[in-house]
Amino acid sequence: MNLQHHFLIAMPSLQDPRFKRSVIYVCEHNEDGAMGLVINKPVEQFTVETVLSKLKIMPQARDPAISLDKPVFAGGPLADDRGFILHTPRKGFGSSIQISPDTMITTSKDVLETLGTPEQPDDVLVALGYAGWEKGQLEQEVLENAWLTIEADTDILFHTPIASRWREAANRLGIDICSIANHAGHA
């Protein structure tokens, strides 16, 4: 099972406040473990503009038509002082990894310097921190019915309203997530 470029959709029974009703985009999944970003839990009163201001990044070619009043997400409980930028493919950043034909993740400052300019990637999601799993841990959580899985959809990732992402991701599986009982079993 390789869940890279998949969504993990928290089952209603998952009560950990860090992951309750969350959707996680899996950026990497291999024999050593997995890493992903929560894409539906914005940090309150923290925007992309706030991040750029705190880091003293003032792009020279700033386009006022491009809004920086976009949420920054609590990507997960690990390394929550580090930024992770999911975006549509654009080459030329110092530390980028292509996740799928439609998505990349960048952790270098140079991507931040393009935000709000004509040089920024078409779609961008900024997160602080990440969710991580040790070898076999994610697979076990899936077997224990903590998560539903589905191949990621960039429309949900970048364009679906934040409050609708959990329900919409489950809807893509044909499931009304709110009607699922809190405890599931295996047939």
UniProtKB/Swiss-Prot annotation:
It comes from the Bacteria. InterPro entries: AlgH-like. GO terms for cellular component: cytosol. NCBIfam families: PRK00228.1-1. PANTHER family: UNCHARACTERIZED PROTEIN YQGE, UPF0301 PROTEIN YQGE. Belongs to the UPF0301 (AlgH) family. This is UPF0301 protein Spro_4027.
